[in-house]
Amino acid sequence: MQFAVNYSLPLEELLRTGKVEVDLLKCPDWQGVIHAARRLRPVYVHFEIAVGNGKVPTLDYDVLRAMFTQTHTPHLNCHLIGNSTLDPGSRNDQLKQIREWVEELTFIRNNLPDVPLVAENLPITPLEKGSRIGADPDLIRETLLATETDLLFDLSHARISCGAMEYKLTDYVSQLPMQHLRELHLTGLRRYHGLITDHFELSDSDWQAADWAQQQILSGEWRQPEIVALEYGGVGDVFGWRTQPDALLAQVPRLQAMFGNHATSFSPPY
């Protein structure tokens, strides 16, 4: 199990001065960011691939293959997008959603047969009409088991979905294939522009959720993931403005102690 954090300039400074430590740096599929980050620590790429919107056949699979040779990316991630035309309460529509996901995941696997595949749960949000059917844990489980795809479990996404459904987190998670967990994402939640939003620093309730996740892993209820990533901070308009050095300094060492590979060493490729 390795601990990763979103690459950012404040995190780079903390790493260079030895104030924090991480096993991996999590990067978007942007060459400039990858080039900067890989001088600091091993890098893995988090792709913006969506499954369920019909665009999987248009992906540049040669570019994806190149990313794997350039980085320490252990698997190809994708995001399960719900079909906004389907009724979440209709079993026929649920089966149609599963078929759409299975078809696109199979297409990816046929083009990248040697690359492990993981799919991420997305949150329910009023901004995305298809998000409710897309966050259905039963449909996620059926799809992943049918395609031998592992789970990238975003804990904050699950917490947001549970709030929207008035569902207990433990009940929601019990319906997911946690024995196929390969990557775990952690963030803080905050109300922002009227909505519960992720990718903020962790507050007390977020730490409680992270502690619970750690216990599920230690007890064997969940498979031990290869990577646990703190999705706080980053680059660009979405993440750059909420990247505070003090928050990184307070959070990263604590999470590294909880989830990190303490035997990791790295020599930068100068």
Could you describe each region identified by the protein language model?
Residues 1-68:
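N-terminal pre-domain/capping segments
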Residues 1-7, 20-27, 41-47, 74-78, ...:
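Hydrophobic faces of well-ordered beta-strands that scaffold small-molecule active sites
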Residues 9, 29-31, 49-51, 80-84, ...:
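Active-site-proximal loop/turn and secondary-structure-junction residues that shape catalytic pockets
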Residues 40-46, 101-112, 141-147, 208-220:
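Alpha-helix-loop-beta-strand connector modules within alpha/beta enzyme cores
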Residues 52-58, 89-98, 161-225, 233, ...:
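Gly/Pro-rich active-site loop or hairpin
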Residues 58-150, 160, 242-247:
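Active-site acidic/histidine proton-transfer and metal-coordination neighborhood
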Residues 128-131, 155-156, 162-165, 196:
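A short secondary-structure junction signal
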Residues 239-269:
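C-terminal helical cap(s) of enzyme catalytic domains, especially alpha/beta-barrels
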